[in-house]
C-alpha cells in the first residue's frame, strides 16, 4: 500500500475512534487546528507523563515550571522573535494561493531524491540479490547527474536562506521551474517575509492597551524564570528546568494533519551548564534523548540524527532526531547548544544581573544552555503512525490494530462479560471496581466477543479480560494479549500484578536506567 494511502487511513482512524477531531467540526472546522478526543487525550497525557517523569523524576537536578502564555512583549524583542521570526512567502497570481518559498524548494529537493530512489528500485529489480546499492550510487550516470543537480540546488538554497536573500529564493523557484500545485503555472509574486507570531492587546481601553503576543515557543518562559528557580531551589550548575505547554504560530502552510499546526504543545528542557562544557553536555543529551525514543520499541530503523550544517548565529551545535513518518523522515525533537545567547539577551534588555555565581570557580558568569525540545503533537503522530497495523488473519479476515507501547495506551484493560446475563455483567463490574484505581479500564458488553476484541484492538488496548460462566466457579478469567491474540486463564487476584508489570510508566522508565 502506498505511504500516502496509509497516512490517509491513519487520519481517518484517528477521527473514527476518538483520537483527533477537526476543531469546530460542526462549523466545518478551522484550518490547521485540531481537538483531541477521548482516546487522544489519554494517549497524549501518557506521552507527557513519560517525558515529564523521565526528566524530573529520574534527574535530581531537573525541576519543572509552568510559565504564562502571555509575557512582557520586550521578552520577544530580546529573543529576536519580533524582528526575525519570519517565513518567506510567495503567492501564485493565478490560483491566488500562498506558499512558503522554502517549502516549495524543499519539495523540489525531495523530488530529486525520489528520482534517485526510483532509479535504485529499478536496478534492484533488475539485478536482484547481486545488486550493490553503494556502487550503483557511485557509478550510475543518471544517478550522478540527478545527485549533482540536487546538491547544487541544496547549496544555493542554504546560502539564500542563511543570507536572507528573498530575491534569490524567488530566482531558485523560477530556475527550477517550480509550478503551483493548484494552477500548474509559474506565475509567481515576489518573496516577502511574514512574522509568525499572533498578537493581541492587553488592557481595558484602546489607548492604554499594550500589544502582547501568544508565545511562539515555551523556552523563553524558562529563561526569564531561570534566576527565580535557581535561587529558590538552591540549584547548582549543571541543572535543568522542564516545561510542557502550548505555543502558537501563524503558520501559512500548515499541513500533514497534526504535524504542523497553529496551536501546538511543546515539551522543553533547558539545561544550564558551565561555559566550556556545553559540547560535552550536548553529546550526552543527544544520546540520552535518542535512547528515550528508542525505549518505545519501534525499532532503530525508525530513527536517525540530522546534524545541522548551517547553525543559527547563537548556536554552536544542533541536531534533530527524525522519525520515519508515512511521508518520510521528519523532525520530532531538536537538541541545541544555544550558548549564552538567550540569558545574555534577557540580561541586556531587562537591565537585571542574572549571572550565576560558581562557588567552585569563585566567579560569576552567564550559563550556557543545552536545549531539548519535542513537539507533543508530532510525537503523538509518530506513535500513531508506527503503531497502526492492518493484519491478515488465518481465517482470511483483516484486523486493524494499534500496537501502541502498552505504557502509553489510552485504555490499559477492557473487561467483558461473555454474555449479558447469568451474573456475568455483575462479576465483570466487580473486577473493574477492584482495578480502576490502578488502570484506565473499559467495560464492554455490546456485540459478540469477537467484535468487542476488534474494537479494543483498534484503540490499542493491550489486554482484554473475558468473564465467563467458569469464572463464577473458579475465580479465573481469560486474559487476551492484543499483539499475539493469545489467551490464558488467570486468577482474578493475580490480575493487578500481572498487568501492572506490562503497562506501567514505571516499567518503561526503568528501561532508561539500563
Would you name each region that the model predicts?
Residues 1-514:
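NTP/phosphate- and nucleic-acid-binding module
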